[in-house]
């Protein structure tokens, strides 16, 4: 896309705002390089990533990107065999830690909402835990290696501490015994060796090696001979320490080199995630949405807001183009918001085509344009010089030379800066030329000729910015279908210009112009009233919709509570009966034991009578659990798929979804529940034969429409399993032998959830992953019973 439009529409300022939300310098660099994409596939992918980032930020908070630094040069140094400094290794550690934490951040439970785009990115991350732990253990700060880096280093430093302690004890003794020869009763260090400050005149009184002297020459820093050997030992240990540190750093650098490819890949993915989340954070700040992207030149921006205008000052605008008209002519007074409208439309398109969410309402759409041209001056002046006219015309000529079949062109004061009649004629000619090439245009103007042109020309529409005559201020609302007027007479009257002067001015205007201006004013007033009525109606409708939704949800919750309470009561009753049966069996068992111990045949017969009486009583109690509230109805002897029946135990009508098995049980559907019951427990309904036949025909027709393939991509596991369960029931009743379930490859979570459900499903005979030409690992082939 041309750089001039990006500059004029202030896309660079948007990117500067976006950079504030990027953590790493590498992500900020991606922001600097951001330009509109050249195909809808890329645009939709980038918009979906931004939208997922926004949703994640709202649900889970900020991702763990802290500590990520640009390590490109560091990895190149390691790959060439160079030794990394502790500071460089800490930067590598920051990336490794961010890699591990980011992957943990994206882990979720099966029931949680999925974010496939970003989860796929995080899935590619390859944590290098061993290297992370080793650097963390070895490097203490940007300039210090830890004692724990190696056993050798630990031992060397322990010896150093011991030697230093011995030297300090000895030198303190020397200071005390030679205090009269010393400048101060203390010791110091010169060149890593312990020395004492001796007065120059007593140099011969303290035998030792001179290492330094004061600036005046009055003090000599002498290493006493008694310390030379100890100082030599300390120096040797310090050299060993340095050598061991170099070895540790070299070993760590080698391990970084060995893992350089994984580090580079992780760094690239983390940078991309940092960039994507910066877009999500900016969208959160703007209260932005993901627009639909069309490729037919039609767009509908609803409540669009300019992202660079302060929230409390920006006025939302509605702009449509490409459906009923291809050119929009905006007229109205200066400072009325015409130029802001142009810039808002252009900038929101550039943002969306660059993968950024836009500040607008959720039902907004943009269109894919290969080019967005903007001829917008930096200054809005009443007087325009010839040089300004020439500059605008030069830019227009460049625009007209381009193939504008997929272009959005924005003109500010088209034809301005020259004679009004010539300027208007030139503007009309330019519009017609560009329209004939398929371009979509929005232009602002003051010329009445262009208002009349828009009224009479097909595919061209007038628009104006609303102006409040009472306050003499623009409202900045865009009124499509209504041409604007300058309001010069009304403004002059409000300011205090005499009536006679205004009347005189009107006499110089033609009758046609006065009538035209009056017509425009009437249209504006009616449009304003209509807009207000529409806004009021929308508020009432939204309130009604919310109220309806609220009570529907409340009713649904009540139904669920009622069903659950009923089922809980039945389960509790069944448990009571079962416990009673168990207790009876225990009693009978005990009675048989007593019989073995000596009860005669007469007692045996009585025991059997009591046993039968107890069993009969329990069975009667169990039957009472399943009695209907009203008449039980006639017992069903035969059933058919799709037949309605009455189930007394639930006191409701159910639908038969399977034929009786070898145990005499059928599966029925009761609302959202599927349960197995005995055929003898079902009762005929009071439905007429005609209604039954009609129902069967409707059912058969419904099942005949069942397709042999269902696509679940984009759904979460819970929703997907629900749809598959219902789909398999329909497919089974539609006599489909084999069906295909498309779940995509992704992270494999959805496929696992589907497979777990298929293992338990009553209609599934067998299932397998798709083969070549069947969708591969992204699909599962299911054979039905």
Swiss-Prot record:
Stated role: Endonuclease that is involved in the suppression of homologous recombination and thus may have a key role in the control of bacterial genetic diversity. Acts as a ribosome collision sensor, splitting the ribosome into its 2 subunits. Detects stalled/collided 70S ribosomes which it binds and splits by an ATP-hydrolysis driven conformational change. Acts upstream of the ribosome quality control system (RQC), a ribosome-associated complex that mediates the extraction of incompletely synthesized nascent chains from stalled ribosomes and their subsequent degradation. Probably generates substrates for RQC.
The keyword Transcription regulation is assigned to this record: no
Descriptive protein name: Endonuclease MutS2
Lineage per the UniProt record: Bacteria, Bacillati, Bacillota, Clostridia, Eubacteriales
Signal sequence, start to end: none
Subunit field text: Homodimer. Binds to stalled ribosomes, contacting rRNA.
Binding-site residues, ATP: 332-339
GO MF: ATP binding; ATP hydrolysis activity; ATP-dependent DNA damage sensor activity; endonuclease activity; mismatched DNA binding; ribosomal large subunit binding; rRNA binding
One Pfam family matching this protein: MutS_V
